Amino acid sequence: MSDLTVDPQHPWPGLASFTEETRAYFHGREDEVNELARRVQRKLLTILFGQSGLGKTSILRAGIVPRLRREGLCPVYVRIDYAPESPSPSEQIKQAILRATASSGRWTKPGTAVEGESLWEFLHHRDDVLMDDAGNAVTPLLIF
């Protein structure tokens, strides 16, 4: 479905999800987007669940993520690969954070993940702050 075009003549992505790039065509879910964005900002853990095909991914990618990005959060999409040859889930999360934040700003003390450190250590030992181009602090937001 990667060749599907969403534009004014074709404003619906079919079975694909809306994305940040196609958010201009995503309408009618403003109440849900507002409520979920408030929950994400208030709670350390927010779980969005429901039956397949209800539009959870579209709400996240075309509704909540663009709004939270404007409000100083950096979305980090994480898909854990459980194949035997894959890095540990903790390592995959650390790498996803480094990839996502590389395009969203800069760390005050750039670094990389240290071999063998836990995810908690990675997130807390750095004494580091992610800044946007305007010098505002940006908070990574993990989305699984």
Regions inferred by a protein language model and the residue ranges of each:
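Amphipathic helix/helix-loop-helix segment enriched in hydrophobic residues with interspersed Lys/Arg
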Residues: 1-144
